[in-house]
């Protein structure tokens, strides 16, 4: 009788180990992201640590709280962003991700806040440069530093977008009409 319980317990333990290993692995990042920096630090409860970002372009900040809970605040208008004054934030219990647009004025202020629920928080922040192409509503495309044209996306014009919407509507309408005809006949 103890054997089935032992097997069940081993299965539960094995699944917990697999989940733990997956959590500890680095998350996959897109190929378009180029790792620029890795910053590790420790912050006390209720305190801020400030960093300054000078890199141009679209930047991704991925911060993992290794112990405790560190939160992320970003601003292009103040060098010392806080929970009262910021443009972008991520305040999760775990991994915090903020995407800083290319149009933000440099230098960008980064504030890391140690949540009061923990005496101290350890964090690791990875700074990535996003090399993907941004699409603009007026048909302009801003391309990354790679100007070879190998991975450039073409911007849609308003006429193409209208034609695509019209095509989708016609497809839906014809499908509904076929369904009605099939039911009737």
UniProtKB/Swiss-Prot annotation:
Subcellular location per the Swiss-Prot or TrEMBL entry: Secreted
Signal sequence range: 1-23
Keywords tagged on the record: Apoptosis, Glycoprotein, Secreted, Signal
Any one biological process term the GO annotation gives: apoptotic process
Glycosites: 47
Broad class of the protein's primary localization: secreted
GO CC terms in record: extracellular region
InterPro entries cross-referenced by the UniProt entry: UPF0669
Record family assignment: Belongs to the UPF0669 family.
Matches recorded under PANTHER family: UPF0669 PROTEIN C6ORF120 (PTHR31703:SF2)
Summary of the function given for this chain in its UniProt record: May be involved in induction of apoptosis in CD4(+) T-cells, but not CD8(+) T-cells or hepatocytes.
Name by which UniProt lists this protein: UPF0669 protein C6orf120 homolog
Organism of this sequence: Rattus norvegicus (Rat)
Organism lineage string: Eukaryota, Metazoa, Chordata, Craniata, Vertebrata
